[in-house]
Amino acid sequence: MFNRFNKFQAAVALALLSRGALGDSYTNSTSSADLSSITSVSSASASATASDSLSSSDGTVYLPSTTISGDLTVTGKVIATEAVEVAAGGKLTLLDGEKYVFSSDLKVHGDLVVEKSEASYEGTAFDVSGETFEVSGNFSAEETGAVSASIYSFTPSSFKSSGDISLSLSKAKKGEVTFSPYSNAGTFSLSNAILNGGSVSGL
């Protein structure tokens, strides 16, 4: 059991930490069982400080409590049950996932980008339903090639934006954007979307 825990710690370190001073970059492909166990350890946290990427064999990545201050690309579906923060100057790229769930705090002070590498794909389901969703940086999604409707749901207890939120969805299959009442001091731009929203202050 002790050896297994040590291997787990090493896997986490390789996946989420890089030696920025040397410019090294690590790419890790880990089973969902290993990744999901991260969230069961209350003291587990991670910091991506340089150029990293995460993927898993079954297409689902379970993010631990994480602060991202460098560039991190996550490929596939993402489940985050603990707080995720993209620090100023950091970038989180969510690549080729059909579902993203953030059920704790999501704070974007840098850049969070939803991207696809294929010309056509199924629409994305993106759900933020934790305590706090805060954007002072840039949140953008480019879904113009979706062949089914993309669904974006921003329904946290507290939703504040002083940055830029941009959702460009498919013309062929209009997406749906649902948001709870929120405070806006930035820019929220949508295209090809059906809106289901609460009140907005600060416009």
UniProtKB/Swiss-Prot annotation:
The keyword Lipoprotein applies. Residues 185-203 form a propeptide. Keywords: Cell membrane, Glycoprotein, GPI-anchor, Lipoprotein, Membrane, Signal. It is a lipid-anchor; GPI-anchor. A lipid is attached at N184 (GPI-anchor amidated asparagine). Residues 1-23 form the signal peptide. GO terms for cellular component: plasma membrane; side of membrane. It is found in: Cell membrane. Its main location: membrane. Disulfide bonds: none annotated. Glycans are attached at N28, N138. It comes from the Eukaryota. This is Putative GPI-anchored protein YAR066W. It comes from Saccharomyces cerevisiae (strain ATCC 204508 / S288c).
